[in-house]
Amino acid sequence: MKRSTERILVTHAGSLPRPEDLWEMLIAKSNDRPYDREIFARRLRSAVAEVVKKQIDCGIDIVNDGEFGKHSFSDYARERLGGYVERAPDPDERPPAIFGRDLVDFPEYFNSKGGRAVVGRHALRFFCNVPIKYIGHAAVKTDIENFTAALQGVKVEEAFLPAVAPGTIEHRLKNEYYPNDEAYVYALADAMHEEYKAIVDAGFILQIDDPDLADGWQLNSHMSVSEYRKFAELRIDALNHALSDIPQERVRFHMCWGSYHGPHKYDIPLRDIVDLILKVRAESYSIEASNPRHEHEWRVWEEVKLPEGKVLVPGVAGHYSDFIEHPEAIAERLVKYAKLVGRENVMAGTDCGLGTRVGHPKITWAKFEAMAEGARLATKQLWGR
């Protein structure tokens, strides 16, 4: 895995804005509506090539495919894993929400049309009712082939493909088959190992997306911190099981606090889970760090030593706002981290994927350009050139 040995490198967390025509086909595919599969396949390949070039043009060093073949976490998991049925929950059942603790203080916000994260009650959900198996071989092969084609003739520092952690899949696909949480999460880990290995065997960096690690705290609003740490540790152990034969230097780990637009008043503090994050078998750790609830947590690294050989990728541009971060503010953030963990151990990242979370694709590209300029300013301060 590349490091910032000569300058601060720039990357991002994954999801990028899909072209409108591709997005319409993804929605049709997700909803089992008719769409032309050949047109979709051709457009997906051309769109991935376009978004790779766009990332390079904006100054991104470590690029991905924009996750263009995926509509949502739930659809992605359904496409890659077998063993699930889709049905409505019981009439009185309200699925746990990633803002469960905030909901107690702000029910009016979450139940209003003005609240951007709205409480749902009767949406269809997925339930595991037979043994899980991996069925995503064709889908991940398509991801790999499209990305490989897009990288031909272009120059990047590195390339990554994201895949979802077992614990995050567990949130969306509920267990009705396995005897307990441990058996279920480890079954998910065994299945997802096939995708993780396929990505690394293709020569790409594997990014593990795991918002579960932090947003599970709000989902399980009845738990104390100590109870939640046990809950999270089991899921990290399962993830490490899935990564056990994959070289750590080929893995980057991304976590955030759920990425919903809302108060985030009761997000679990980074200091309560940072040691768990560092247990993950990865070389780099991408952590939400630029928004008003978590920006102050750079100070956690005054007390916590980043392990030798690891890389920290703090979010220096956010997905919660359409504000374009000033390059000087981005540089300040990067320099703070570099002074604590070493300049070669820091890369510029985003809080989460910007794909569907900012108001317009041009906002995403402007944020990327600001990150690249901020990294140049930070490099000048840290290297004197």
Predicted regions and their residues:
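Domain-level signal for soluble alpha/beta catalytic cores
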Residues: 1-385
